Each structure stands twice: as C-alpha cells, then as structure tokens.
C-alpha cells in the first residue's frame, strides 16, 4: 500500500468505531493511492502525506456546505485540499480534509441499493481525488474523474457507481 498519514475525527455516534473506520479508510485510500501511483503515474511526497477525515452528520455538513460553498443543504461528501494542486502533479505534505455525512450516505446507499460500506468506499475515493486536484465542474473534468473513480473501485472489487445511474456527483 502507498503510505498515507490518515487522521480521523468521528463527530456522530451513528458511525462505526474509530478503529474500524481507520482500518477501512487505510485500505480504501491506500488502494486508491497505489492505483494512482502505479497506473496513472501520480507522484506522492516521499513522506506519507496527511489526509484528515471527518465523519459527521447532515446538520454539520449542511453548515459547512453553506459557509464554504454557499449551498445551504446537506451533501454526501465535501473535500478541502490543503494546497492547490493540478491533477497528476505532486501534492503537498498535507493533502487536506474529507468530510462525510452519515445520514446522506445511508439514504443514498439505500436509494442506489448499495451497501453502506460500498457507498462509503465510493465517497472516500471521490473525496480523495478532489484532494489531488480532480474535479467535475464540466463534462470533460467529470469524465476523467468518474473514470478514475470507476477504475479504482474496480481494483477494490466494486462495480461502476455510475453505470445505469442518472446520479452524478454535483459540482
């Protein structure tokens, strides 16, 4: 696995325990980093870059979404890169923060008929790609980012999250 320094904060009691989440996230994000390094030639710092993960609830993520994006509603995942980085370029020693809302994750997983863990995996990969400079503000960016998500998830044994879905990640 590629080394990442993963820091976790659990702010909602409905989430699994911190040790369980840390182990899960190390597996998912480690696999994503290895895929990006080996298949996409994504450079990483020699020292393990830090990723901060916050597992919260809809109310908290709604407040953050309103403050930072001007969207006063809950969302599934928010990512805040620590430093500006272009896709495929060397990131800084701190990648940034990924914040995930439990209730939205649970609701979407049920709607998509996916397990909690499978949808959490997708949201972690999606957020991680944002920290590395990928985005989906237009169709060209979305095609690249969603293609990477699909290939990384396939490495983890998961199907294409966008296949047959009209649900795309909102900008």
Curated annotation (Swiss-Prot):
Q: How is the cofactor bound, in the record's words?
A: Binds 1 zinc ion.
Q: Name one GO biological process term.
A: rRNA processing
Question: What gene codes for this chain?
Answer: ybeY
Lineage runs: Bacteria, Pseudomonadati, Pseudomonadota, Alphaproteobacteria, Hyphomicrobiales
What is the uppermost EC class here? hydrolase
Report if keyword Nuclease is assigned.
yes
**Required cofactor(s):** Zn(2+)
User: Which EC number applies?
Assistant: 3.1.-.-
Q: Which UniProt keywords apply?
A: Cytoplasm, Endonuclease, Hydrolase, Metal-binding, Nuclease, Ribosome biogenesis, rRNA processing, Zinc
The subcellular localization recorded is: Cytoplasm
- In Swiss-Prot or TrEMBL terms, this protein is called Endoribonuclease YbeY
InterPro entries documented for this protein:
MetalPrtase_cat_dom_sf_prd, YbeY, YbeY_CS
Gene3D superfamilies the UniProt entry points to: Metalloproteases ('zincins'), catalytic domain
Tell me which family the UniProt entry assigns to this protein: Belongs to the endoribonuclease YbeY family.
A GO term for molecular function: metalloendopeptidase activity
Q: What does this protein do?
A: Single strand-specific metallo-endoribonuclease involved in late-stage 70S ribosome quality control and in maturation of the 3' terminus of the 16S rRNA.
Organism of origin is Rhizobium johnstonii (strain DSM 114642 / LMG 32736 / 3841) (Rhizobium leguminosarum bv. viciae)
């Amino acid at each position: 696995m590629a080394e990442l320094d993963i820091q976790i904060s659990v702010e909602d009691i409905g989430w699994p325990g911190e040790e369980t989440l840390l182990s899960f996230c190390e597996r998912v994000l480690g696999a994503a980093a290895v895929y990006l390094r080996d298949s996409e030639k994504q450079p990483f710092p020699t020292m393990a870059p830090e990723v901060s993960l916050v597992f919260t609830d809809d109310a908290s993520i709604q407040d953050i979404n309103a403050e930072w994006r001007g969207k006063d509603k809950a969302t599934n995942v928010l990512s805040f890169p620590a430093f500006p980085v272009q896709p495929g370029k060397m990131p800084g020693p701190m990648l940034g923060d990924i914040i995930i809302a439990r209730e939205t994750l649970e609701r979407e997983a049920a709607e998509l008929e996916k397990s909690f863990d499978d949808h959490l995996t997708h949201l972690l990969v999606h957020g991680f790609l944002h920290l590395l400079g990928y985005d989906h503000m237009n169709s060209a960016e979305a095609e690249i980012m969603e293609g990477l998500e699909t290939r990384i998830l396939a490495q983890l044994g998961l199907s294409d999250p966008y296949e047959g879905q009209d649900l795309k990640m909102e900008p």
